[in-house]
Amino acid sequence: MAYTYRFVDTNENVIYVGYTGQTMAKRISQHFTKGHLPKKCYKSIARIDYIKWDSKSDAQVMEVYYINKYHPKFNKLDKQGDRLNIQIEDEKEWEVYQVIKKPNIKYEAEDGILTWIMIGALVYAIISFFI
């Protein structure tokens, strides 16, 4: 069993395509702990999708196919030039592995700070109400 997976941003752009012969959980965990991609990529992910394949070879071929189809900005250019001289039926559906950000919501680095400010203001208002 193997998987081809993709990272999708909040604008529904495919920003990275990869494959793994491991479980999806293990591979995604590796991305977020020992990630080889720029931090900007990981911060841009809204959703992770995957397709399950019968063999690692199938997953590798489909990785190259999808990189050439989507031209993700965080894939290395060496795989984007690979050409497949075979007919591929692109009929399998992507399944959602994990939703990280909801679509159509703008996430900013300051969101964490704003959240704490709002929590602080709410706590202050509650304390002021009871005093």
Model-predicted regions and their roles:
Residues 102-131:
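C-terminal single-pass membrane-anchor helix
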Residues 2-15, 21-105:
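Structure-specific nucleic-acid interaction/processing domains
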